[in-house]
């Protein structure tokens, strides 16, 4: 499945963090969709084209892991990247069992998150972009 403009779903209950990531990815040519919690993310994946989901671990209503599990039921091949300031080995192992593409510790750098997103898109869709901007 070839894609021209990847659509990224950024899911975090912190609106400033969502907007920061939007400001990282949109100037690089990505289309971004924003969700404040897991239920909103599920609605977006069911109704819009989404190529990758970035998920905060700690959100109201559904955790990032719960959201990941439900997203995979809707769209099994959707690459999902889990992010958290509070990571432990149990969370990382659970994310791997749920087929998360990657687990990132917040705060993440612009270069780090851009590289992981590109790797996920390359693996899932054979999509290639120019060099990452830091």
Question: At which residue positions do the language-model features occur?
Answer:
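Two-component/phosphorelay signaling modules centered on CheY-like receiver
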Residues: 15-33, 98
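As written
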Residues: 64, 95-101
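CheY-like receiver
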Residues: 124-134
